[in-house]
Structure formats: structure tokens, C-alpha cells
Amino acid sequence: MKTLTRMQLGALGEQLAVEHLSGQGLQILTRNWRCRYGELDVIACEAATRTVVFVEVKTRTGDGYGGLAQAVTEGKVRRLRRLAGLWLAGQDRGWAAVRLDVIGVRIGRSANPEITHLMGVG
């Protein structure tokens, strides 16, 4: 596999995360939603439970920056909540529940990328 730029690596990680979420039965509502305060990587929904799921994707090639749990700081969770609130404020549809998830994608250690899905982080 050729060396990827940070942007290419991030895009590949997000694509693998979207495929994982779709495989879990979630419907992808939007990707890379941006506002002046930041970006939400993936917004999905569980139709059966009417739950909207905001997903932060962390793509790594190794453990140099710590594991997935270290990548999701209290500040990061606060930022995700704020962004989720802003997205929800612009929607006409009501949701029964809201969930924040983090998906870690590790590329390069083996032939198949490793995906870790932490549900309900905040």
C-alpha cells in the first residue's frame, strides 16, 4: 500500500466507518457537516429507535498518539455535544434519542483495517 497523506488517510477512515455503520443497520444522513464551530464527521440514524447518532471518526496508523480512549477527551465530547445541538436546532424532524459515538480505524497493522466502535461516549 502506498503512503497516504493525512487527508487521504482521514477520508479512507471515514469511508470505512460509514461502511461499518451501514453494516450495523444505520442510515447515513450526512457526512462532514460543518459550521463555524467545527465539523461532525458522520451523522446517522437508527430508524427503528428514532435515534440520531453523531459519530467522530479517528483514523490511526499506529499507537503513537495513544488508543481510542485517549483520543476522546472531555473537551472533545463537549465540542461534539455543542455541534450536535447546533445541527439538531436546524432540523425539522424530532428524534426520540441522541447518541454520540466514536469509531477508531487503525490502518496498516494488518491487511484488514481494525475498527473499534465506542457507543454512547457522551
Swiss-Prot record:
CDD domains, per database record: PoNe_Nuclease
Pfam families: UPF0102
Gene Ontology MF: a single term: nucleic acid binding
InterPro entries for the chain: Restrct_endonuc-II-like, tRNA_endonuc-like_dom_sf, UPF0102_YraN-like
Entry's family note: Belongs to the UPF0102 family.
NCBIfam families: PRK12497.1-3, PRK12497.3-1, PRK12497.3-3, YraN family protein
Protein name in the entry: UPF0102 protein MMAR_1812
Lineage, highest ranks first: Bacteria, Bacillati, Actinomycetota, Actinomycetes, Mycobacteriales
